[in-house]
């Protein structure tokens, strides 16, 4: 009985390792099918940090002009400068 339990545990561990290996291979295949070079990844990371708070002229009030920076990064500029 004890031997059967050990064999069962070994089989379960083997099945789990096969599943994990298959998932890793699938992830590698997806990466090969849709490769992104470092420049593209860097650009995407920088776009997330960029200031994207553009106000249409219809919403340009004095208060909105002062508070038009959505993200507080040094490269953010107020985009409502023509109020």
UniProtKB/Swiss-Prot annotation:
Residues 51-83 form the ShKT domain. Keywords: Cleavage on pair of basic residues, Disulfide bond, Ion channel impairing toxin, Nematocyst, Neurotoxin, Potassium channel impairing toxin, Secreted, Signal, Toxin, Voltage-gated potassium channel impairing toxin. Residues 1-22 form the signal peptide. Belongs to the sea anemone type 1 potassium channel toxin family. Type 1a subfamily. Residues 23-49 form a propeptide. InterPro entries: ShKT_dom (IPR003582). It is found in: Secreted; Nematocyst. GO terms for molecular function: potassium channel regulator activity; toxin activity. Disulfide bonds join 51-83, 60-76, 65-80. Very weakly blocks potassium channels Kv1.2/KCNA1 (Ki=2.24 uM) and Kv1.3/KCNA3 (Ki=1.23 uM). Very weakly blocks potassium channel heterotetramers formed by 1 Kv1.1/KCNA1 and 3 Kv1.2/KCNA2. Does not block Kv1.5/KCNA5, Kv7.2/KCNQ2 and the heterotetramer formed by Kv7.2 and Kv7.3 (KCNQ2/KCNQ3). One of its GO terms (cellular component) is nematocyst. The keyword Transferase does not apply. This is Kappa-actitoxin-Aer3a. Specifically, dose-dependently and potently blocks the voltage-gated potassium channel Kv1.1/KCNA1 (Ki=1.6 pM). Moderately blocks potassium channel heterotetramers formed by 3 subunits of Kv1.1/KCNA1 and 1 subunit of Kv1.2/KCNA2 (Ki=56 nM) and weakly blocks those formed by 2 subunits of Kv1.1/KCNA1 and 2 subunits of Kv1.2/KCNA2 (Ki=14 nM). The record marks 72 as: Key residue for binding Kv1.1/KCNA1 (occludes the channel pore like a cork in a bottle), and important for the voltage-dependence of peptide dissociation. As a specific Kv1.1/KCNA1 blocker, may be beneficial for treating Kv1.1/KCNA1 gain-of-function-related neurological disorders, specifically pharmaco-resistant multifocal epilepsy occurring in infants.
